[in-house]
């Protein structure tokens, strides 16, 4: 079974109204279901997607997550220091800025070894590296 991390962007694309690339990500989510992929995200990604979606899509999205469509990894408060370290490492103002959701996914990839990711942030995730130097395989 394949394991895939999911960023907020693809979830917003699928659940948002008239979003660009919605079909691409809808097809990927269908493929994930058909092939029994293990989909994982983090609470910051769920919060970001929820914030970007308007009602009633927001409610549909949260019910989808609540029904177990993907695993939501929690983190301990102490991990925020690690996230800040990642954010500082990858922020080059004013050009680029790593947000909390991205930092949480890089941390999750490092913790689990999963480097395949669904994201609309291709430019950013092409730059991010795990401590062992591995990059991300972007779907």
Regions of interest found by a model, annotated:
Residues 2-4, 23-97, 103, 107, ...:
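PIN-domain endoribonuclease scaffold, especially VapC-family toxins
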Residues 1-20:
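Metal-dependent nucleic-acid phosphoesterase active-site entry motif
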């Amino acid at each position: 079974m394949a394991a895939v991390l999911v960023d907020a962007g693809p979830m917003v694309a699928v659940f948002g109204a008239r979003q660009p690339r919605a079909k691409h990500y809808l097809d990927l989510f269908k493929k994930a279901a058909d092939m029994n992929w293990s989909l994982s995200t983090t609470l910051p990604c769920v919060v970001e997607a929820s914030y970007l979606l308007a009602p009633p899509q927001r409610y549909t999205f949260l019910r989808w997550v609540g029904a177990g469509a993907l695993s939501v990894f929690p983190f301990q408060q102490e991990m925020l220091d690690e996230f800040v370290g990642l954010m500082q490492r990858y922020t080059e103002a004013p050009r680029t800025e790593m947000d909390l959701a991205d930092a949480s996914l890089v941390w999750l990839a490092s913790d689990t070894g999963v480097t395949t990711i669904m994201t609309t942030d291709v430019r950013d995730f092409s730059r991010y590296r795990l401590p062992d130097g591995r990059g991300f395989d972007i779907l």
